[in-house]
A protein has these predicted regions:
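Ordered alpha/beta subdomains of enzyme catalytic regions
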Residues: 1-211, 237, 310-403
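Glycine-rich phosphate/ribose-binding loops and adjacent secondary-structure elements
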Residues: 3, 184, 188-345
Length: 403
């Protein structure tokens, strides 16, 4: 195969995304047909999902859509970055975003708009579910970007961190978020030394003090034996131990962890924290959360399925219209507690809901091409998502509609 002549890797450049080159070809056909017919209708488009696990998710990617559409002839309303959105079995959905634009101009940007929202939201939603499964007292670290396309690593880690993980391992993502990367040591380091104790002692000698001494304890011997060896090698400098045993040979992980905790404690190692990684999902986390201090979660979150958002016209030149199976007209979403009501925008019902304590979820993002929303810092987003998830986990939730 011949080399690419303008890039090293099979990835889109930022300017190519902005120009709509990552679109599907039938949108180019559509644009050409509209230009031929001298048509460019003003449309309202809504982005929504119908089927999401447990009927809720975290919407993320709003910031990137704003950067994509900034300066264009568009008006955009959207939920807040990190907001919880709801779905139901009803055909009446709640949009997470609403775009008013000339269709010939916006059509080729459907792919990147959906891509930004679907990918980030899918990862954030999975990370939020894992956070809820773990509870507030257990640490969660993201270790999964090695199995994702490297160009996507910052997006993946941002979504995971905002959704409630305590740290991420990817270096570039950490730099972009202005946080310290977190990590332990790989099996490869221990194999390179050929002796666990030599590797642990070298790690302790080489690493600056702010790097926690977490010994990997399942490379060559039984986990209990290596845990005792690590404590003997590093003593009070040993912050924690990590078990990364594959599920194919780990046995009953809870019993292994409890055995290690006992053996460390009777040797004055009660200070040593226990971390588990390797093939973890919500079920395993629930089973272990009361006996471990933290989890390293990889592929189950970094390779999360995207949210299946749709991008549908609901109004053309001010006239409500929609394809079969969708519902026409610009909509507003109002929330009180986590009971959401969908209605037509600018209607008497909308005004009634606002007057009776319901919060509008679709807010101005772009007005006449200008971004009018001030985006929050990543740390503030994390705090907001944490607060919302805590409230949500204790509340009933529903979606209904009213006209």
């Amino acid at each position: 195969m011949n080399d690419l002549n303008d890039r090293r890797f099979w990835i889109a450049k930022e300017e190519e995304i902005m120009q709509g080159k990552t679109t599907d070809v039938y949108f180019l056909y559509t644009k050409q047909v509209l230009e031929y017919a001298k048509m460019n209708p003003r449309v309202t488009i809504e982005v929504f999902a119908r089927h999401v696990k447990d009927n809720w998710g975290i919407v993320l990617g709003i910031y990137e859509v704003a950067k994509l559409l900034e300066g264009k002839d568009v008006n955009v309303k959207a939920m807040d970055e990190g907001e919880i959105f709801l779905t139901s079995q009803s055909p009446i959905y709640e949009p997470v975003m609403q775009i008013e634009a000339n269709y010939a101009d916006i059509a080729i940007l459907e792919n990147p708009i959906l891509g930004f929202l679907c990918s980030s939201s899918g990862i954030a939603s999975k990370a939020a579910r894992i956070r809820l499964a773990a509870g507030d007292k257990v640490l969660l670290f993201s270790f999964g970007t090695r199995r994702a396309h490297p160009a996507l690593a910052p997006m993946i880690e941002r979504a995971i961190y905002i959704a409630g993980f305590d740290g991420v391992s990817n270096v570039l993502a950490s730099e972009l978020m202005h946080i310290d990367a977190v990590g332990t040591m790989p099996h490869a380091l221990i194999l390179a030394f050929g002796d666990q104790r030599d590797a642990w002692k070298a790690f302790d000698a080489a690493m600056p003090e702010y790097v926690k001494r977490i010994a990997l304890i399942d490379t060559l011997y039984d986990e209990k034996i290596e845990a005792i060896m690590a404590l003997e090698a590093l003593g009070k400098r040993l912050y924690g131990v990590r078990l990364d045993t594959p599920s194919s040979r780990r046995g009953n992980m809870r019993k292994i962890v409890e055995e290690i905790r006992w053996e460390l404690s009777i040797r004055d190692g009660g200070h040593v924290k226990i971390f588990v990684s390797g093939g973890l999902d919500e079920q395993e986390i629930v089973e272990l959360r009361d006996v471990v201090d933290g989890f390293g979660v990889g592929t189950s979150v970094s390779a999360s399925p995207p949210i299946d958002f749709s991008f549908k016209i609901v109004e053309v030149n001010g006239r409500p219209i929609a394809k079969r199976g969708d519902v026409a007209g610009r909509k507003s979403v109002y929330r009180r507690g986590f009971n959401d009501i969908v209605t037509l925008a600018d209607s008497k019902v909308a005004r009634y809901l606002e007057e009776h304590g319901y919060e509008p979820l679709l807010k101005d993002l772009i007005v006449d091409g200008k971004v009018v929303r001030e985006f929050k810092s990543i740390e503030q987003l994390r705090l907001d998502v944490k607060k919302r998830l805590n409230e949500f986990s204790k509340a009933e939730h529903s979606v209904s509609w009213m006209l």
